């Protein structure tokens, strides 16, 4: 059996042994320690085991951010099963696809979403067990009843979790219009330092001129370390390239030990948090890669994760939580989250002095938003993460002392390249457009789709890369300029939407002959789904009826914001859509209706 020190379950339990009474999850008045989360996930695992779950079975989770979400994933992992995400905004047809595509044997679902499950449940042949967070119906098990089982480690009749297992499936939008499962393995821990270490290295030179608020005491108590960091001696030392290199090397080594080292290293790191607690507020949904991979990091480190209580994003609740819990880092998704937060900061009076890190993943902060955040929170370090279910990267950090705030910037590195059509590296200053390639922190492939796996995960000169279609150029200074997804993927508020799925739903309306949707620039959402529709000859299209049909068949974020009627949708002779002309038509129609 492969050594299992990388697998989440044993890593988590090593942290539990080290800091059983340390807070693990906080959501309003609900607080669970590492020991309590461990016991609750053990009980859930034993309930699944008693109801016929088997090694390698898939366990789907359809829930908002909560401790129950984390516990459900841990329970599945302890059984050497494969947890997977279900977007809680999905409609019945989308839920049916994921349950059947994954072959899920069990589903943990919040009672709010039972109406989505009800009409398609009979079509989910492999689904044997449904556990309901809230009130359960006949034949199902309530989550609280499931927790009444034994809290001891599950007595497995099969091989325990190991590094050969699939750790979890992350379902994401696919180019065919249906979500596809991306397989992540425990080796994710081997490569987390590739995401974090370059960011730390690029931060070190900036510390010599960092704002003094960055090193201000958070608890009102000064320490020798903080006094040193505030001193002129530290600023002089950290300005020296040799010191930056040696310190960067040491930090990278510590990160490798933290994530991929023996279990005792995880326990050692966790014990250190008693002196420096790090509360991370995960404001983006756990059902997406950004949220869940952040949670994985927290669990491996022995930190505490905090969730908001409301069913809808509430900026005032977030700032109250930051103040009440002395939050040190926040994970959100771009301007769609940040702009309402800024508006609330303008209206209210909140203590944000505890904040150190503001991270956006999936959608970058605009420079204007970064500038505004730093004006309100001068001690914060701002980060943009290149986020996709198939690979991750992190931008250079931005501090208030940087002056003019730049747009998101990534740099060529060992784990991040740009390749042209001949698999040659695009060099700095070359005007060529290539495809961004990410190595290291990448998944194993797509669930049940070997062809797409071969196309997306390619080995070039002995190194495996994820190439998901983001086109890019390399600037003179080695920074990477992202140009957009070659496949036409629309990124709206951090949700990735592929045009083909929306178009196929629109075409179900009898009066619609042809259609196309694109993403147009939107101040809040990054991109807004907008489209054109052409009627059958002699027919008239009722736009409100089309939008209502989309609302019935698609998650709300996939519904077009605007649709316009045109005589004909531009296509090439081979039938392919002419997207440049489609965008022109959309803009023309928007200007007419303005």
Residue ranges and their predicted role:
Residues 152-171, 178, 201, 265-280:
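Conserved pre-ATP/AMP-binding loop-to-beta segment of ANL
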Residues 109-118, 220-221, 235-236, 241-250, ...:
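Adenylate-forming
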Residues 50-51, 78-149, 159-160, 537-539:
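Structural core segment of the AMP-binding/adenylate-forming
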């Amino acid at each position: 059996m492969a050594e299992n020190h990388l697998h989440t379950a044993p890593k988590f339990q090593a942290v539990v042994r080290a800091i059983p009474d340390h807070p693990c999850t906080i959501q309003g008045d609900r607080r669970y320690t590492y020991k309590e989360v461990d016991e609750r996930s053990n009980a859930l695992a034993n309930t699944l085991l008693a109801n016929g779950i088997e090694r390698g079975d898939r366990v789907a989770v359809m829930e908002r951010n909560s401790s129950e979400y984390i516990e459900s994933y841990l329970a599945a992992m302890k059984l050497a099963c494969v947890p997977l995400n279900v977007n809680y905004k999905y409609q019945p047809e989308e839920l049916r696809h994921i349950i059947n595509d994954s072959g899920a044997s069990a589903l943990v679902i919040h009672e709010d979403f039972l109406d989505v499950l009800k009409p398609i449940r009979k079509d989910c042949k492999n689904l044997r067990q449904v556990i309901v967070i809230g009130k359960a119906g006949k034949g199902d098990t309530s989550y609280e009843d499931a927790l009444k089982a034994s809290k001891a480690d599950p007595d497995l009749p099969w091989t325990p979790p190991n590094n050969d297992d699939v750790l979890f499936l992350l379902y994401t939008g696919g180019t065919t219009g249906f979500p596809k499962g991306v397989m992540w393995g425990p080796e994710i821990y081997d490569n987390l330092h590739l995401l974090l270490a370059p960011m730390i290295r690029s931060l070190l030179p900036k510390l010599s001129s960092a704002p003094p608020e960055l090193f201000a005491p958070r608890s009102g108590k000064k320490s020798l370390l903080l006094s040193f960091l505030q001193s002129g001696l530290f600023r002089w030392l950290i300005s020296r390239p040799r010191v930056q290199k040696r310190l960067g090397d040491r930090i990278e080594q510590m990160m490798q030990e933290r994530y991929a080292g023996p279990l005792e290293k995880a326990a050692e790191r966790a014990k250190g948090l008693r002196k420096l607690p790090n509360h991370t507020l995960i404001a983006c949904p756990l059902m997406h890669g950004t949220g869940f991979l952040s949670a994985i990091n927290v669990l491996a480190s022995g930190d505490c994760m905090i969730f908001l209580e409301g069913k809808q994003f509430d900026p005032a609740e977030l700032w109250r939580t930051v103040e009440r819990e002395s939050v040190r880092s926040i994970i959100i998704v771009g301007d769609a989250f940040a702009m309402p937060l800024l508006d609330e900061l303008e209206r209210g009076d909140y203590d944000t002095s505890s904040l150190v890190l503001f991270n956006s993943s999936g959608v970058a902060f605009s420079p204007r938003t970064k500038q505004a955040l730093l004006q309100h929170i001068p001690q914060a370090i701002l980060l943009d993460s290149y986020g996709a279910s198939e690979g991750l990267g992190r931008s250079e950090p931005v501090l208030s002392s940087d002056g003019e705030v730049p747009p998101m910037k990534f740099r060529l590195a060992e784990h991040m390249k740009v390749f042209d059509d001949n698999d040659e590296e695009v060099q700095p200053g070359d005007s060529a457009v290539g495809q961004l390639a990410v190595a290291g922190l990448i998944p194993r492939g797509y669930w049940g789709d070997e062809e797409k796996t071969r196309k997306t995960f390619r080995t070039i000169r002995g190194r495996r890369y994820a190439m998901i279609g983001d086109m890019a150029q390399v600037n003179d200074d080695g920074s990477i300029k992202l140009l957009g997804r070659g496949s036409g993927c629309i990124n709206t508020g951090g949700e990735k939407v592929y045009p083909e799925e929306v178009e196929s739903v629109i075409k179900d309306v009898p009066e619609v002959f042809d259609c196309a949707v694109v993403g147009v620039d939107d101040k809040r959402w990054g991109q807004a789904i907008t489209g054109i529709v052409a009627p059958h000859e002699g027919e008239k299209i009722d736009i409100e009826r089309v939008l209502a049909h989309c609302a019935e068949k698609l998650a709300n974020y996939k519904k077009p914001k605007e649709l316009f009627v045109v005589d004909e949708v531009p296509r090439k002779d081979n039938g392919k859509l002419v997207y440049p002309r489609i965008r022109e038509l959309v803009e023309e129609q928007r200007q007419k209706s303005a």
